[in-house]
Amino acid sequence: MAVVIDTVGARPRHPEKQANPDTPVLRKPEWLRVRAPGSANYMATREVVKSNRLVTVCEEAGCPNIGECWDKSHATFMIMGEVCTRACAFCNVATGKPLALDPDEPARVGEATAKMGLKHVVVTSVDRDDLADGGAWHFVETIRAIRAASPATTIEILTPDFARKPVAALESVIDARPDVFNHNLETVPRLYLSIRPGARYYHSLRLLERVKERDPTQFTKSGIMVGLGESKEEVMQVMDDMRSAGVDFITIGQYLQPTRKHAPIDRFVHPDEFRALEEIARAKGFLMVSASPLTRSSHHAGEDFARLQAARLAKESAA
């Protein structure tokens, strides 16, 4: 049996995937190849992250855009540790039993945001099914700490689904008033059992709907991956579901297989197909659409937030 050699500390990153059959990691087409990171700005961002003892999803998820984003002094902070309680078939974040929450982490995220001079910050997390509120209050404290340390910074959060947690947990995060509330649907309903087995599609959809019900002024955002075996019709249905839930901003990107033990890539979606999906999504009424092979939830998040605000103003002016 092949062994996943990627580790967190002394243990395998994905112990639950050790028994999975090996599937070849396909060679990327030209449009998915990026330069290896290493610029001076990249190293400076890395130093701020490390000196503040923070975790980023850029590193943990193996994001292909890390070189570009860190060169621009952008980073997506991942709170509540580096070990997730879920075992999604697409994700490179480690799975296992997490450590206790670090009560000083919110303040360190705030300090790093101020130190990096971020105009827009993205905060995500691992799933913490072991916590009574799923980590909701830790999100609230992090939002407050960022506002205290860097009042002018706009805040985008990418949350877990808070499944089987009190509704009050989600409501506390909404009431902290992040500028953008993102929760990814990740894939089409038919593929949930194999790709996102610990989650439920309609629960995630309802979460996005609840955000709009509680605070209609809050921007909502969600994303999916393509290249997992979904059909165009299924993607279009997800778009319709998102619009029914009031989602303002959709992101669509290519799934990239982290290791031989993860879900295999069904196909590489050509950039022309992404452009077609973008046109379809815009026609369905999304305020913002980002659809490309390298699109990820937090890629160009600051620039996209400015466009999102402008799109809302234009829509309100035209009404």
From Swiss-Prot:
Cofactor(s), by name: [4Fe-4S] cluster
Catalytic activity: [[Fe-S] cluster scaffold protein carrying a second [4Fe-4S](2+) cluster] + N(6)-octanoyl-L-lysyl-[protein] + 2 oxidized [2Fe-2S]-[ferredoxin] + 2 S-adenosyl-L-methionine + 4 H(+) = [[Fe-S] cluster scaffold protein] + N(6)-[(R)-dihydrolipoyl]-L-lysyl-[protein] + 4 Fe(3+) + 2 hydrogen sulfide + 2 5'-deoxyadenosine + 2 L-methionine + 2 reduced [2Fe-2S]-[ferredoxin]
Cofactor comment text: Binds 2 [4Fe-4S] clusters per subunit. One cluster is coordinated with 3 cysteines and an exchangeable S-adenosyl-L-methionine.
Domain Radical SAM core: 70-287
Biased composition (Basic and acidic residues): 13-24
Main location: cytoplasm
UniProt: [4Fe-4S] cluster 2 binding residues: C84, C88, C91
Record bears the keyword NADP: no
SUPFAM superfamilies xrefs: Radical SAM enzymes
Region (Disordered): 1-24
Family annotation (Gene3D superfamilies): Aldolase class I
Name the UniProt record assigns to this protein: Lipoyl synthase
Organism classification: Bacteria, Pseudomonadati, Pseudomonadota, Alphaproteobacteria, Caulobacterales
Gene label: lipA
